[in-house]
Amino acid sequence: MAEPNFQVVKIATEETYALRSAVLRADTPTSDPKYAEDSKPGTVHLGIFDENKNLIATSTWVINPWQHDSSAMAIQLRGMAVATNHQKSGLGKLLLDAGIIHAKTLNAKYVWAKARDSALDFYLRNNFVSFGDGFTEGVTQMPHHLVVQKLF
């Protein structure tokens, strides 16, 4: 269940970096929190702030084709990060729901992501399906699976 009184808001790219570094780059070979798609036209960054105005959750939503239906509009979820002390509190689902609403406003047929295996159950519980074999992601060197949700 989500923590009380938290709202998902659009944020600037630079606001994502500290939380991405802390959550997504820990125990990986890189400390760089930037993505090539961060400034791509149409990219949206979402965030949730605590009562002290600290960013405690973030996600990035990029217009990027789903490789198995490249003619359809699709949104790739990247950089989903929830501060360690707020994980399993519902904030990830709040971000996911807001991002899916965003994707629907763009008439996206799919939302997809390269999900870390450590987060795979989260996506499966939230109406994504795993697609294909697992792989080791090049930047983090961590095991991942493609996940996708068909919106219509």
Role assignments for model-derived ranges:
Residues R78, A83, R116:
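Residue-level recognition of the GNAT/N-acetyltransferase active site
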Residues E14-A18, A22-A72, R78:
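Acetyl-CoA-dependent GNAT
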Residues R116-D117, T136-F152:
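C-terminal "cap" of GNAT-fold acetyltransferases
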Residues M1-I11, F152:
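Conserved N-terminal entry element of GNAT/NAT acetyltransferase domains
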Residues L124-G134:
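Conserved acetyl-CoA-binding loop of GNAT-fold acetyltransferases
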Residues L96, A103-R116:
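Conserved GNAT acetyl-CoA-binding A-motif
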Residues V82, K88-I101:
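Conserved acetyl-CoA-binding loop-helix of GNAT-fold acetyltransferases
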